[in-house]
Amino acid sequence: MTRQGNRARADIGIIGGSGLYDVEGLQKVKELSVKTPFGVPSDTVLLGELDGIRIAFLSRHGRGHRVNPSEINYRANIYALKSLGVRRVISVSAVGSMKESIKPGDVVLPDQFIDLTKRRVSTFFEGGIVAHVAFGDPVCASLGAALLDAAHTVGATVHRGGVYICIEGPQFSTKGESRLYRQWGASVIGMTNLPEAKLAREAELCYATVALATDYDCWHETEQAVTVDSILTTLRQNVVLAKRLLRTAMPAVTDVKSCNCQRALQDAIITAPDRMPASLRRKLALLIDRVVPVKKGIQ
């Protein structure tokens, strides 16, 4: 294992959810221990090449699945990827289906989120620097299109768009909750994509989710209610498909043009530069230097 160095760079970050703890075909792998101003990420970062493309892989729950959704240090995870030069993040997540048409084993590429989390810090900007980023379209359309093409190429049953509802967990929903979420128009349900997507936007990273449907939550009248065992059974098949999808998508993801995601902070920071606490300004330098240049003489 090595510590992060100046040469440790990647353009694409992959955050692996339940069942996805590595990237198939990754070569020249280095295991990096990345320190951030926001603490330690969920695990070490695997940096390597996938068909010549530099990839940074981070296991969201840690290898061996040690960290529950409420305990994940989302800020450290996103900051760590940003510090390695990542500009585009692909999230791979196990989800429950909230629609009859989305069957276990299907792939969903959500384009909207509903945040029902309760215990999580959802911003980098607090304690003296305030920012309000636009989040009406939380998923990078260009990145999503590249993933859609790859899903078709590998023969996945894929659903374009949809609403991912993120609950706190770690318990699964009650039937009453599950039925309510269906009335709201939810497509899938999970526990991890928020605040992850919000923080990616604040870090000016393109973000998109590959959601792997494993079950029907607990709303379905004729299907078994969700259990860990049922999730793992379907997940083993889904992960094989997800690895093929990711590898197929890489060339197109690399070619994704610069978009508004990478300019999210342009007019978002409202705090006057001369009122920013110096220590906080230094802490957020990686995120805000592009839009709030450091004045000469300020350390």
Predicted regions and their residues:
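Metabolite-binding pocket within alpha/beta catalytic cores that recognizes anionic/polar moieties
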Residues: 2-136, 291-295
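Non-catalytic positions within long, well-ordered alpha-helices that form the structural scaffold/packing
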Residues: 82-85, 182, 201
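His/Asp/Glu-rich mid-to-C-terminal helical/loop segments that flank catalytic regions of hydrolases
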Residues: 218-265
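A cross-taxon signal for low-complexity, glycine/charged-rich
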Residues: 297-299
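Zn-dependent metallopeptidase/amidohydrolase metal-coordination segment
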Residues: 191-229
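A short, charged, Gly/Pro-tolerant segment at domain boundaries
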Residues: 258-294
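Histidine/lysine/aspartate-rich catalytic loop segments that bind and position anionic ligands
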Residues: 127-131, 135-171, 203
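Active-site/ligand-binding-proximal alpha/beta "capping" segment
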Residues: 153-187, 270, 274
